Amino acid sequence: MHAHLIKLLSLSSLTAALMAAAGVARADDAQAPTFKAEPCCSLCPAAHDAKNYTTRYQQNFTTLVQAQGDWLFRTQEDLRTEFDTTPGGYRRMKELHDAFKSKGVELVVVYQPTRGLVDRNKLFPAERDKFDYDKALKNYQAMLGRFSKMGYWVPDLSPLTNEQQAHDFYFRGDQHWTPYGAQRTAKIVAETVKKVPGYSSIPKREFESHISGRMGKTGTLHNMAGQLCGTSYAVQYMDQFTTEPKGEAGDGDLFGDAGNPEITLVGTSHSGKNYNFAGFLQEYMGADVLNVAFPGGGLEGSMLQYLGSEDFQKRPPKILIWEFSPLYRLDQETIYRQMMALLDNGCEGKPAVMSASTTLKPGNNEVLVNGKNGIKDIRNGSNQIDIRFDDTSVKTLQARLWYMNGRHEDLKIEKPETSDTDGRFAFELREDEDWADQQLLALEIQGPEAGTAPQKVAAKVCKRNVFPSAAKHTAQAGL
């Protein structure tokens, strides 16, 4: 037997096997196996087709884009490069600012940077190359500048788009910021608030924030992917924070409810308690904040609820912080009609030009008619309507306003399901385009559904509030 074979036989079977395997590996080096890693959660083709986003809610997510790991983005919202509104939107925003200013309220606008601006590095290279970050950032900053020229106090949140932080600013599969994102935003906002006239006279006290638990977020983008593709994503867990006055832990007065805070926060669900944005503002401003934001409130929900409240009417704040995202259109005329009416409490305490009370039955109900006691001059541009249901849980108003020339307007106002309602709907008569000179003839209100109890309602027309008139602004001229 050859010596090398005898030597091989004397080795353990394991060693021999290893040597043999090594020999095979060397022999096959040129044909080594290759491996390909597939993404853990790829979106299905249906998610890339805008036609599949059929409901109003689903259209907020058009269209989903898969990114690294569990990250999802929306092409229309997260990856937008345009930040703008219509000339009518700018005019109304200016009028709103001037109206608040006339009541001694300074408005601070917190205009969130998009997920695309902040988290573009989470995109796959192909999508990142398609997203024009430089254009998006330039246009975002230009919009901040336009708010500022209208008179709003506007924190520059663009530095948040270039941060390298250990904790995510936004959730991977949700449009909301994390508590860490809220914290970093609040720090910048607080520096702007400290420059607002009147801040120096606001009572101060120290606050401190600490981690108080963990929250699990099943993201809205992940849920939408599940609806379209039947996929599921892991819950993302994140630290939760609580903010308390120093030395007063557990006193239950986190948002100053026992006192009269002179700073109020209105906004979207980003300002809800889950993310502690109001708490971080208190910590960095050193002052109490009344937080009236609620989940599902959208652009206007908490603002309208607050304007109609006794808190605002009797104790308006010195500083009002209004947080919202570029998702929301700023030219929604019906929203401004309500805000401007409620700023001076609708028709409360004002002489009635026309009024009536009735019980609504299913179908259209005639509530007000101009002419029963002589024809009155009720021009749209000078008047507003205040409608109150006895049932304070009513969240939807459907009305038809008739005019002397036979024209009519169908108006529908829906309050968020999550809002605390008072059964009240106050709004200016329509004055955009050529509506200002229309003469009101009648008001009809849609009654309750068949088979339900009748609804008692009172309606009143009065002269609208007089605020300083704003100069006409457009995106190009004056802004």
Curated annotation (Swiss-Prot):
Active-site residue numbers: 174, 176, 269
InterPro entries: ALGX/ALGJ_SGNH-like, AlgX_C, AlgX_C_sf, AlgX_N
Keyword Transferase attached: yes
Functional pathway: Glycan biosynthesis; alginate biosynthesis
Entry EC no(s): 2.3.1.-
Transmembrane segment boundaries: none
GO biological process: alginic acid biosynthetic process
Cysteine-cysteine disulfides: 44-229, 347-462
Region entry CBM domain, spans: 348-476
Family from the record: Belongs to the AlgX family.
Assembly with partners or alone: Monomer.
Role noted for this protein: Plays two roles in the biosynthesis of the exopolysaccharide alginate: protects alginate from degradation as the polymer traverses the periplasm, and also plays a role in its O-acetylation. Probably has acetyltransferase activity in vivo.
Domain topic, free-text comment: Consists of two domains, with an N-terminal domain with structural homology to members of the SGNH (GDSL) hydrolase superfamily and a C-terminal carbohydrate-binding module (CBM) that may bind alginate.
Protein name (record): Alginate biosynthesis protein AlgX
Species annotation: Pseudomonas syringae pv. tomato (strain ATCC BAA-871 / DC3000)
